[in-house]
A protein has these predicted regions:
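Catalytic cores of the polymerase beta-like nucleotidyltransferase superfamily
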Residues: 2-9, 14-430
Length: 430
């Protein structure tokens, strides 16, 4: 009965948060609409080619093909988002996305290798083998209050109205992600102050962060992801909004939240990311049992950070491994301080992550396997235990154990014996 009452209270709390968020969004749209006639037309900052470091040789060849093709047909076509940010920072972008004035069907007609996806807002995927260049028509925020209310419970409000480069820039999440690269004259276009924030190394919400985070609570996690990954600071008002609204993350779509949690691990910045998750309250919201374990003893928190710091050293070397396996290993490292302090409870402890974060079952089972392997690999490889080297996940379990041993400053002698045995057996097969 108590569980049912607690669940009911949780539902009521989330409903209250939802209505509060909808009210804020409607209010912001009204102010935006009423102020539109009075507002002067803003002009972007345009940084010409000699004044920035982006070179076409660093842009994906197929992305350039899309840009040049759309431009030759008379459409506006820009490189947009994180790709522009990373190029300006001298980093190699993971993705190259295109924004254009061309309608989705017009993009499809321009490329035989184009496929349209999405129901409420059509996106064009221009495929080159296994690679996809995502091409989106410029958007703007919808002014229809009915649409806001109708779709509010589905997660982030979808901007399903076509717009201009300016409106498209303002609907993005953070200023550093609102920059455009113009293929026509090779300039960088900045409507939102992203160039200054890149120079200041600041993550700043576009618009009022209290409203933007209510529109989509997952943006709070994205702020942490970018700040940790880029070694940036979160701007003061944006940070205050996260501290105040962190519990709204519980109203977000579970699969999106789970995906964003695992996006905190790559690039060797998980320790910094989870420190911020803890500081701003998001870790307590999403991983309550792990957070309670940490709160019971201050020394436990430092152990969690220590394991994550060691994982960060491994991330680059393991970047090409299977994504599913990597997430199992990452989850095990995150919970290692708790699980290794209470032997025999690995399934139960990882089960808390399964229930609270809704991680995939495969990730859960792999994380349990990693934790279970600690007892086995802490002893020399005698005959009774040798069968484990034939398990397909043995190399990853060995990596996990090295992370644990190195984080604790212990000898790797026994692990080296297992590694030698594994090398001998695999060499026989070849």
């Amino acid at each position: 009965m108590r569980k049912l009452q607690t669940a009911a209270l949780g539902v009521e709390h989330n409903r209250h948060l939802l209505f509060e968020a909808v009210f804020e969004i409607i209010q912001s749209r009204m102010f935006e609409f009423l102020g539109r006639k009075k507002a002067k037309k803003s002009e972007p900052v345009i940084r010409a080619r000699p004044d920035h470091c982006i070179s076409r040789k660093n842009i994906d060849r197929d992305a350039l093909r899309v840009l040049y093709r759309l431009d030759s047909l008379g459409y506006t076509a820009y490189l947009v988002g994180g790709g522009v940010r990373d190029l300006l920072l001298g980093r190699k972008p993971k993705d190259f996305d295109v924004g254009t004035s061309a309608m989705p069907n017009e993009v499809k007609h321009a490329f035989r290798n184009c496929f349209l996806i999405g129901r409420r807002f059509r996106l064009a995927h221009v495929r080159f083998g296994q690679k996809v260049i995502e091409t989106a028509t410029f958007r703007q925020n919808s002014q229809t209050v009915g649409e806001i209310i109708e779709h509010a419970a589905e997660g982030p409000f979808e901007d399903n109205t076509f717009g201009t480069p300016e409106t498209d820039a303002y609907r993005r999440d953070f200023t550093v992600n609102g920059l455009f690269y113009n293929i026509r004259d090779f300039s960088v276009i900045d409507w939102v102050g992203g160039l200054k924030d890149l120079e200041k190394k600041v993550i700043r919400s576009i618009g009022d962060p209290m409203i933007r985070f209510r529109e989509d609570p997952v943006r709070m996690m994205r702020a942490i992801k970018f700040a940790s990954r880029l070694d940036f600071k979160i701007e003061k008002d944006t940070e205050k909004a996260i501290r105040k609204l962190h519990s709204m993350i519980l109203s977000a779509s579970a699969p999106r939240v789970c995906e964003e949690v695992f996006r905190l691990f790559p690039y060797g910045k998980s320790e910094a990311a989870f420190r911020m998750m803890w500081e701003y309250g998001l870790m307590g919201d999403l991983l309550p049992e792990l957070s309670e374990f940490i709160k019971r003893d201050g020394g436990r928190k430092s152990r969690v950070w220590k394991y994550l710091a060691m994982l960060d050293r491994y991330e680059t070397a393991m970047a090409k491994q299977n994504y599913e396996v990597m997430n199992g290993l990452r989850a095990a490292v995150l919970y290692a301080a708790w699980a290794l302090s209470e032997p025999g409870r690995n399934r139960e402890i990882m089960g808390t992550m399964l229930s609270s974060l809704k991680i995939p079952k495969a990730t859960y089972f792999l994380s349990v396997l990693m934790l279970d392997s600690v007892k086995r690999l802490s002893q020399p490889p005698e005959r009774s235990r040798r069968r484990f080297i034939y398990n397909r996940d043995f190399p990853d379990a060995l990596d996990f154990n090295r992370i644990v041993v190195r984080a604790e400053g212990r000898s790797e002698k026994v692990l080296d014996q297992w590694q030698n045995l594994y090398n001998e057996e695999t060499s026989k097969e070849t």
